């Protein structure tokens, strides 16, 4: 890592390199990292200008939801269909978002399952560092690959049977509630609201 540029080359064999003058991979958050509710996605997607995620200033990332207002990215607008309460928490610094994979890619999918698994494995230590440092109360997993990864990091108290939609797990001695979901951008509105009601139960405890 140079003095002025944060670089990660762990995935250069898969044509991914993290490079930013503003923040390191473990600093990558949209919103307030000290928020008690986190949404975790798989990886950021590049917008048309190819600079949306990799060149933003650290302050812009921290203030992302306050700065965007009604022009917030469509990815985040989907969460309003899940829960307006959750969506409103973004602007209040009560909810934040990060990804397992910190490098932005041209799409939300990878060229193969092997590449996806390799990239997730390489980037996973950054997420572990984030979770241990900030210790959110609630983690919402956005997508099957995210669910599987989080279950391997935040260990359930007992083996899951595959039907659970949430669990309490731990990493070291820290415990956290984890909500499991398919990719919110692809599930229907009925499933989104069912998910939202479950999330709201935990938010309102």
Describe these PLM feature segments.
Residues 1-71, 123-126, 130, 167-172, ...:
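Active-site and ligand/interface coordination hotspots across diverse enzymes
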Residues 43-47, 101-105, 144-148, 183-187:
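Short, solvent-exposed loop/turn segments at secondary-structure junctions
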Residues 2-16, 113-128, 147-205:
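C-terminal capping/extension of enzyme domains
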Residues 127-143:
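Proline-aspartate-enriched helix->loop->beta-strand connector
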Residues 40, 98, 141-142, 181:
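Short hydrophobic segments within beta-strands
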Residues 96, 100-123:
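Charged, often glycine-rich, active-site loop that binds/positions anionic groups
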């Amino acid at each position: 890592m140079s003095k002025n540029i944060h670089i990660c080359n762990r995935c250069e064999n898969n044509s991914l390199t993290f490079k930013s003058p503003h923040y390191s991979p473990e600093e990558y958050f949209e919103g307030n990292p000290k928020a008690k509710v986190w949404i975790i996605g798989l990886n950021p997607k590049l917008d048309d200008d190819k600079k949306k995620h990799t060149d933003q200033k650290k302050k812009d990332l921290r203030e992302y939801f306050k700065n965007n207002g009604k022009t917030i990215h469509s990815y985040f607008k989907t969460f309003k269909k899940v829960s307006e309460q959750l969506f409103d928490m973004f602007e209040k610094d009560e909810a934040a978002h990060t990804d397992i994979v910190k490098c932005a890619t041209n799409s939300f999918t990878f060229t193969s399952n092997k590449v996806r698994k390799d990239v997730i494995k390489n980037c996973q230590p950054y997420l572990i560092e984030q979770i241990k440092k900030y210790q959110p109360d609630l983690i919402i997993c956005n997508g099957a690959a995210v669910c599987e990864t989080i279950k391997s990091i935040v260990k359930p108290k007992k083996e899951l049977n595959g039907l659970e939609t949430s669990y309490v797990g731990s990493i070291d001695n820290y415990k956290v509630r984890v909500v499991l979901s398919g990719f919110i951008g692809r599930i229907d509105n009925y499933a989104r609201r069912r998910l939202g009601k479950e999330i709201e139960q935990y938010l309102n405890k």
